[in-house]
């Protein structure tokens, strides 16, 4: 159930819907090029919307889930066309495919903390920054 809610929220392209999965003071750590931390639903919503705006046709696919108590590990693939700038990465119309893993600590049905791990070099290469 958790993974289908996650997929539906991300694939809705609505940052507020993604943020609604988090506890009021839930924390999202994006760990790739450098760690970025978003605390609270408002920050999570903004961060999610920036991703969804940069890749407006993006699709999140869950490839595997492991659950143990209040911890859930989700292996995923994110695909989309990089249309708008994302931070220092220019949107050039290139297709992006990122594989990653998210580790969630839940408080009941809500995300208390998420640590997102993905390959930053793949994103940089797709944006034309690397080879």
Q: How would you describe each model-predicted region?
A:
Residues 1-131:
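C-terminal and inter-domain tail/linker signature
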């Amino acid at each position: 159930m958790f993974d289908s809610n996650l997929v539906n929220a991300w694939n809705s392209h609505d940052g507020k819907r993604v943020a609604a999965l988090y506890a009021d003071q839930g924390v999202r750590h994006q760990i790739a090029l450098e760690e970025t931390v978003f605390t609270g639903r408002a920050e999570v919503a903004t961060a999610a919307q920036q991703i969804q705006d940069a890749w407006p046709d993006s699709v999140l696919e869950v490839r595997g889930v492991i659950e143990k108590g209040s911890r859930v590990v989700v292996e995923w693939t994110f695909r989309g066309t990089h249309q708008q700038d994302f931070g220092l990465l220019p949107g050039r119309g290139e297709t992006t495919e990122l594989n990653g893993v998210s580790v969630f600590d839940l408080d009941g049905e809500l995300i208390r903390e998420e640590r997102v791990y993905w390959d930053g070099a793949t994103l940089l290469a797709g944006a034309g920054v690397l080879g």
